[in-house]
Amino acid sequence: MSKEAIEKVQKLIASHKVFVASKTYCPYCSAAKKTLSSIVKNDLFVLELNTIDDGDEIQDALQEITGQRTVPNIFIGGEHIGGNSDLQSLGESKLKEKLKKVGAI
């Protein structure tokens, strides 16, 4: 994995209020995107790793940064949330609180 991939991921995470690394065929990704898109009104960025040439490298970079290789890989305001189960376990009020704090709703 390249230093460039890590820098690209860090830049994407830093430049979006909500960043999700996803794969189009992943049911957990779909659930996370559905939850977030129903609440987030401003700057939800989803990167579908299976639709881009450097998707595997991006996934490796995410593992290096977070210790998590699985998708979805979710960040709110630059903070690593985790996967779909982590997102869902926040509960609606805590999730909305985090999203409000970063200006995503």
Kindly label every feature range from the protein language model:
Residues 5-47:
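Local sequence-structure signature of Cys/Sec-based thiol-disulfide redox active-site neighborhoods
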Residues 23, 73, 82:
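Conserved, well-structured core segments
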Residues 49-69, 95-104:
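Thioredoxin-like thiol-disulfide oxidoreductase module
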